[in-house]
Amino acid sequence: MSIHSFHLMQAPVREAVGALLRPPSASGLHHVEVLVGMQLGAPVVSPRRMQLRHLAVFAEWADEAALDDFLAQRPFGRRLAGGWHVRLEFLRRWGTIRELAHLPAEAGRTDPGEPIVAVTLARMRLPEVPRFIRWGRPVERQVRDHPETTLALAAMRPLRTVSTFSVWTSARAMTGMVFGRDGGDPARLHREAMVERDRRDFHHEFTTLRFRPLSEHGSWDGRSNIIP
């Protein structure tokens, strides 16, 4: 059975740029996105906005054995193994990215009380980037500061690819944020941004993926046990 994984690692700038320009390939690796880290909600002109020493890698594998082999036998895989990663069971997809269009709209049921990992992936329309930043940054801060996220970050690959990754204590908490059921003024932020996106899309392609976390490995920024 295929699985997905999301990895975080620190790397020298030269190695990070090399991985962006030449993403890894391996037997059993169906798709990979190599991105540099961004802090959600950070100012546009800021070293926190594009963190070249922080790599994020999102991948789809034929099975868990293919991932284990890559982490043990490939130089880049061994570097990834020294960071943090979570192994993921795919549950649902909204929207479409060409490389992931084979994923069904729904592959499994979600218990509202179980921990959930959400990944978004977008190919930007470059003229729409200023609008995207204007409407997106408040939502970034909302997700980053939400009491029910244990980790929330963004990543990008110049010039068009943007991704977010968030770990939620429950599916109920995540959908409450998405549909504006949280209390107070922040509740409207995500809903209003979606209305603006529907008015004129920011993206050529966009997908939101929901996963069940299977296992967590390593540590990131001094933290482990990030999955509730």
Residues covered by each model-derived region:
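Aromatic sugar-binding interfaces of carbohydrate-active proteins
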Residues: 185, 189-196
